[in-house]
Amino acid sequence: MYYGFDIGGTKIALGVFDSTRRLQWEKRVPTPHASYGAFLDAVCELVAEADQRFGVKGSVGIGIPGMPETEDGTLYAANVPAASGKPLRADLSARLDRDVRLDNDANCFALSEAWDDEFTQYPLVMGLILGTGVGGGLVLNGKPITGQSYITGEFGHMRLPVDALTLMGFDFPLRRCGCGQMGCIENYLSGRGFAWLYQHYYHQSLQAPEIIALWEQGDEQAHAHVERYLDLLAVCLGNILTIVDPDLLVIGGGLSNFTAITTQLAERLPRHLLPVARAPRIERARHGDAGGMRGAAFLHLTD
């Protein structure tokens, strides 16, 4: 059995998957903040409960926001302060007497989608998250591609390409990102960026769901905004896809629920790619809230 943990600032979610990658059981508990010991206990107790329930010693994978293992072997996860700065992988491996694998939550999202029954035919899968921020991950032959700093797939911190300024105007503001850089695409393509663009052009403060509702009602201003956003997304993806050249692009995050993104993006991409390049198949993420657990569990699938 494959145990997958999706750990965040508020909850620890465990999903148990069988050899056919089907969810057999899940349980959630609040994320302990009092101490590292309490955090370790919460994870180990869930593993013990799963072992007893299924009568096997399952493999353990964990998806967590941040950098799963820094140079000195410790976790960096600002949203999980009880475990941040601690050697989480080594400590859990010792306590559970098995190989515990960690990766960041965006990589786990991409891995979950790459192992979808319909998507396993694609060797190189790119996951793109358009949510509160912009991120993602890459999966090659069923395994996540993880660089030395765990920043593979941090697409949101690529800067606006020159073609974006041609589209938006050379007086378009380069916003300062939380990472300290100017013009990161996350500030324009995330859910918050979607709303900011609307406010910038129309001087109205609306959230993304409100703008999308207007678009669905046929509002001309919302329609023009969505067209501009999709053009900007295509420009930025043109650079990324030229580097990555994936077989499949899976889009997740809150904005993936807006069908225009997956249905209208493909027709815009070719003009931003090399003439010989083929645009990837584009699909909306299939596994929703279970994706984090699935991807974490599947860190052990290619053994």
From Swiss-Prot:
Keyword annotations of the record: ATP-binding, Carbohydrate metabolism, Kinase, Metal-binding, Nucleotide-binding, Transferase, Zinc
InterPro entries to which the protein is assigned, alphabetical: ATPase_NBD (IPR043129), N-acetyl-D-glucosamine_kinase (IPR023505), ROK (IPR000600), ROK_cs (IPR049874)
Transmembrane residue ranges: none
Superkingdom of the organism of origin: Bacteria
UniProt pathway annotation: Cell wall biogenesis; peptidoglycan recycling
Keyword field contains Zinc: yes
Positions contributing to Zn(2+) binding: 157, 177, 179, 184
Catalytic activity: N-acetyl-D-glucosamine + ATP = N-acetyl-D-glucosamine 6-phosphate + ADP + H(+)
Enzyme Commission code: 2.7.1.59
Example GO BP: peptidoglycan turnover
Binding site residues for ATP: 4-11, 133-140
An MF annotation (GO) of this entry: ATP binding
Family recorded in the similarity comment: Belongs to the ROK (NagC/XylR) family. NagK subfamily.
HAMAP family registered for this protein in UniProt: GlcNAc_kinase
Known role: Catalyzes the phosphorylation of N-acetyl-D-glucosamine (GlcNAc) derived from cell-wall degradation, yielding GlcNAc-6-P.
Name of the protein: N-acetyl-D-glucosamine kinase
Organism: Salmonella paratyphi A (strain AKU_12601)
